Each structure stands twice: as C-alpha cells, then as structure tokens.
Amino acid sequence: MKIIVYSTNTCPICVKTKTLLDKWNLPFEQRMIDEDRALMAEFSKVTNGARMVPQIVIDDKHIGGFSDLTELHMDGFFD
C-alpha cells in the first residue's frame, strides 16, 4: 500500500495525520507543497482541486483529509 500525504509546514492537522500514521505503523511519503512549487500543480491535479491540507492519496486514489483517514481506520481498512 502506497500512502502519500500532501501537507505544509504550518499545518497542525498535517502533523497530527503523520503522527497517527506512524502510530498505526503505516509507512507514507510526505509531500510538502509549500516547499516545492512543482508539487502544487501535482497536488491540485491529484486531489481534484482541493485547497486544504492534509490531503491523503492511497494507491493513487485520493481519499480526502484527516477525518477521512480516521474513518477508514475505524472501518478496518488498514487491518
């Protein structure tokens, strides 16, 4: 399973998302859209124009943000 988290340096929910993924022992790739302008275009395309972070992509499918991630976890998606 490939997990990508699009985030920024100033986003507290992004930190919370990364902390939860670490707690759940789920490896992920972090893409900091505020550090690399090329990632902004990718972020917009992959997330269908989402403007808020974090945004999470699992196996090339955009699943949404923090609450969507926790809902997947509660539903047993990562078991």
Residue ranges and their predicted role:
Residues 1-29:
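Local sequence-structure signature of Cys/Sec-based thiol-disulfide redox active-site neighborhoods
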Residues 2, 7, 44-45, 73-75:
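C-terminal alpha-helical interaction module
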Residues 10, 33-36, 62:
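Short beta->alpha junction loops/turns
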Residues 16, 38, 68:
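Residue-level recognition of oxygen-bearing side chains
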Residues 22-27, 45, 71-72:
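Non-catalytic interaction surface on structured domains
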Residues 33-50, 77-79:
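Thioredoxin-like thiol-disulfide oxidoreductase module
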Residues 48-56, 66-67:
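Structural micro-motif
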Residues 58-79:
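Non-catalytic, surface beta->alpha helical segment in thiol-disulfide oxidoreductase systems
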